[in-house]
């Protein structure tokens, strides 16, 4: 399974840049494999992202803004959903991945099942 993070390399918004960097740095630090898909430099990436963000996750006006996160072709969420999952030690579940043994998330899952 490949995590795909749709970003905009040439965004003029500092907020978007910070959010993108936050997601990418977290994935790198936790050795979670991912692909960056640049919507600013590649029209196909932009089109695919816009078409595959579910209706209920789209803004009321305009297009969904990066970063948008997918596991293969399955939509996982935007930055706000990622941030909430990280705060709740549930990023692996958010991404649709199995938490590694010994992680806080794996321990929390084990405690819930007990």
Curated annotation (Swiss-Prot):
Gene Ontology annotations for the cellular component aspect, listed alphabetically: cytosol; plasma membrane
Record-linked Gene3D superfamilies: Glutaredoxin
Chain location of the short sequence motif SH3-binding per the record: 61-67
Entry comment, domain topic: The SH3-binding domain is buried in the tertiary structure, and it therefore unclear whether it directly mediates protein-binding.
Region described as Required for interaction with HER2: 13-50
Sequence segments annotated as region (Required for interaction with PFN1, HER2, and ATG12): 54-71
GN (gene name): Sh3bgrl
Name of the protein this chain belongs to: Adapter Sh3bgrl
Keywords from the UniProt entry: Cell membrane, Cytoplasm, Membrane, SH3-binding
Family the UniProt entry places it in: Belongs to the SH3BGR family.
Record-linked SUPFAM superfamilies: Thioredoxin-like
Source organism of the structure: Mus musculus
Keyword Metal-binding recorded: no
Record's function text: Appears to function as an adapter protein that bridges proteins together or proteins with mRNAs. May function as a ubiquitin ligase-substrate adapter. Additionally, associates with translating cytoplasmic ribosomes and may promote the expression of specific mRNAs.
Coiled coil: none
Single annotated GO MF: SH3 domain binding
Entries under PANTHER family matching the protein: ADAPTER SH3BGRL, SH3 DOMAIN-BINDING GLUTAMIC ACID-RICH-LIKE PROTEIN
Subcellular location as annotated: Cytoplasm, Cytosol; Cell membrane
GO biological process: positive regulation of cytoplasmic translational initiation; proteasome-mediated ubiquitin-dependent protein catabolic process
Assembly, per entry: Monomer. Interacts with PFN1/Profilin-1. Interacts with ERBB2. Interacts with ATG12. Interacts with BECN1. Interacts with translating ribosomes.
